[in-house]
């Protein structure tokens, strides 16, 4: 379920604000979104995997908190991330 190293670095490079940025809310939300998408695909095949379903809900909650933080601090960055990731809200 974890992201591979190349996949993770590609996502980080796409969303980082400056060259050494690996922990900004944008990067964290993008990484969580990719993990959430992978878990959704896993759960489509393994419908009775309740342990993974609970993990999915925790990841969605963490992403929601990060998006709420970003929205309260800088709405323009929030809108940019939402549009780039194709998230609704």
UniProtKB/Swiss-Prot annotation:
InterPro entries per record: Ribosomal_uS15, Ribosomal_uS15_bac-type, uS15_NS1_RNA-bd_sf
Alphabetical UniProt keywords: Ribonucleoprotein, Ribosomal protein, RNA-binding, rRNA-binding
Family annotation (Pfam families): Ribosomal_S15
Positions of disulphide bridges: none
Keyword Hydrolase: no
MF GO annotations: rRNA binding; structural constituent of ribosome
GO cellular component: cytosolic small ribosomal subunit
Keyword presence, Ribosomal protein: yes
Subunit record text: Part of the 30S ribosomal subunit. Forms a bridge to the 50S subunit in the 70S ribosome, contacting the 23S rRNA.
Recorded family membership: Belongs to the universal ribosomal protein uS15 family.
Name this polypeptide is given: Small ribosomal subunit protein uS15
């Amino acid at each position: 379920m974890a992201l591979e190293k190349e996949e993770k670095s590609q996502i980080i490079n796409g969303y980082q604000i400056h060259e050494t940025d690996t922990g900004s809310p944008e990067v964290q939300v993008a990484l969580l979104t990719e993990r959430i998408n992978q878990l959704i695909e896993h759960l489509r095949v393994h419908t009775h995997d309740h342990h993974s379903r609970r993990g999915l809900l925790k990841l969605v909650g963490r992403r929601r908190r990060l998006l709420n933080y970003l929205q309260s601090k800088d709405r323009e960055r929030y809108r940019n991330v939402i549009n780039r990731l194709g998230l609704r809200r």
